[in-house]
């Protein structure tokens, strides 16, 4: 017998291959609301981060692909030839299988009538072709010895020494969940777990009479403890009604994720409304990823090793979602929730306290889950959810090895993709002995399992081929008797076997089922003697199991192929497969439900603190505040929110001892948080906007918060006509009406606009403390007066745009003044000289009216406010031109006055007028600079 390494090493040919399924019973894990629900169709594996994920948003909320259910197959119409213990069954010539030891090929021919695809349902009218006979020593003569801790196989021949022994032990880590630790994993929605394992072994023998041999099996220890069992399971039949998914006996711990119970076990505490709308547009996906079931993240999904795909998605539920509304989640079209059965149920989404947020149903055609929200969404706000979805390769869609897929998962309108390659294992071979097998279905209603076996898939010339199917395993058993259904199909020369080891249409192959070469053994087994073959064959075995057996914990069935290598010496080789479905429950199973874990509450009161002292009930006018949003944040970062009732009360239930939670109070509009931690009584003080609370074995109903109404303030005040242009309001100066005044925030955004009244007054009310900008629009035809004149801020002008800060008080000091643009008289003085050009507008109090021509080298540009009417025009290019200019003037009439005296008077008046204009011009220039 050849000893080979376990599947994990893959350094040498595999001695034993096994498919194992296991059911684990433990509680539905809770998710926070932020919910986390682990959506686990099948067995969960260790989590690994996605290697290459591409997230994209799509608008279509429905899957376009229509996929058929690969498991809806029936074999109720199949007919089997029968051989009973007490009688033989006549068959036609077409269904005879004649065995000739000297012929290299069997004449195995049979035409199957009305073949349909099989399931594990057993027709009560269907009989088997098995006949119980004494064990023939010339057939398979290996005796299996059970060893709990190791497995061995040996290879011996007349000229070959025995190979060294190898031992393979696979163990599963215990699954325990501490309720006191902060668990970022949102949920362990786990009610059961099913593991499938394949074990293959090769044996070489050189003698007909053999000593006992030990078949190499993979030994797997099962988890011994799970917490929080939520229902009593009285027998294995109930366990089998839980979902079933492939697994195998690789050496690695089991994840705490699992499959879900069957739909008949699903109950809803709060049923959603019957009517609702699809609200995918109100679901915001914040994170999603696809990871491989094993930790290698190599992009290869080992489908025969039950490696799965894990879809994680975190999303937020809009507060507009109501009870009865629905959202959708799509798994990839090339995957299935379970590879063994349709008896799975979608887990309910719950928060950490156990309240149900949504319930789900699955549409296999569209590969779509529809979640219906309960009235939970009507009670709570800011709901966040997390789903963990586990699925397996749909072998009906992916029959070939090394198939590359671009898988896509989608929640609501957001999808994520990942590229993977599907890998199937190769047959177990030992010289000409070569085979592979898998459990392909389990029927928990009729208590049957279906095993699909490939015999000689490599098309070797196999001499004296004998196949033994045994229900006696090291870890479990099936029932091989006259109720066992066995069908045999021959694969034609031009036909290929699917690499997936799954047959969905047996009618494509030649049915060669015959009773002559199949005989029941004495040890819960059956032998099928094929003789000499060189074609592949398919064996479909449907056998029963006993779910009520006291020590029944697993289903295991073994198939062994033996071929003769040397007809003269009797040397032969064997290759074996073990297929296992293991059932185990947590400790305490059968003793009733574990008592529920004690949980605690946090509350309690939000009030209006009229006297702003931070202590409740110190003022008769203090009252509760309703509709205040209060948020509880769990240790894992998830959260949920409620609003205070009409009495100002709030409460969060279902909180665990020893954990620390954060309570946050939203400040109501128009209110300000009061003082924190005032006084000596923590039950009457205020915690402020947020506080961390640790549960220490009791409820904490002292988490209160007080608020007082935020005072409102006003801003103004006056725009006046500054007749004296001094920038200070005078008693006789009047207000200007109709001036536009704009109030802005500190960023320049307009808050409000008003106009001054008939008295020049304006006012903005209901303002909070803060920074503001006041802008005055200058009236048409008026000029801004001097700003910030004098020492009284309430009497001066503040200018066109004023920055104002309000701090707990009104501000009625924001004023502005204007005067008319045309209040100045005209006085023009133009002077041209060699050195200067001067324009002078002067108003003086002089009553003179004179014209004079003068020479001037002054540089001046002046305006005066004198009231005289005096025009002085002087054009001078040089001193030589003065006499010439004077001569061109018309003479004045003779008034009888002294000519010299008049000339001197005129000259003196002109000098005074020029001096006055110069002084007044300088004054105006200074005022302009000041303005």
Curated annotation (Swiss-Prot):
Residues 896-931 form a propeptide. Gene3D superfamilies: 2.60.40.1280, 2.60.40.1290, Immunoglobulins. It is a peptidoglycan-anchor. GO terms for biological process: cell adhesion. Pfam families: Big_8, Gram_pos_anchor, SdrD_B, SdrG_C_C, YSIRK_signal. Residues 577-588 are annotated as: Interaction with human fibrinogen. This is Serine-aspartate repeat-containing protein G.
